[in-house]
Amino acid sequence: MSIISTLLGKSKRGGKTSPAAQRLVRNMRYELVPLKSLDQAIADLPKGAAVSVTCSPAKGIATTQQLCEQLLEKGHNVVPHFAARLVEGPEHAAKLAAWVREKGIKEVFIIGGDAEVPPHYQYALPFMKDFLEAQPGVDTIGFGAYPDGHATISKGDLHN
């Protein structure tokens, strides 16, 4: 029996789970990283799971999009992460917005990203502006914030 089933109160042991814990588990979101164990991770997802799909500098945005499409085909609700430092410019931002709109994705997560040499966007905010101008049709945009600082980003850059 999975921990999710147990927390949802479906334990064979007959134990009760509090309604608050059950709500938390029902609303949880999984995060997938494109690693070697990805196929198994996808297979282990519960039906209709909400899944955040990360965007790594090594794999790129196209991999994030491909993984999102694969998950959408399996009936999952996806939240693609877009790293601004991997976006090539306003045209690319508009293409991403069109893709999000076409796929019916209602939430995205935008970060600055870790790519060392950005092709166009140094920070998340300029990309976010271009992305929104292209009318992606999203209801929610998540973004990264580091109130306690970041190991590799200066305080000045964090304020941008």
Predicted segment positions?
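Active-site beta->alpha loop and helix N-cap motifs at the rims of alpha/beta catalytic domains
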Residues: S2-N160
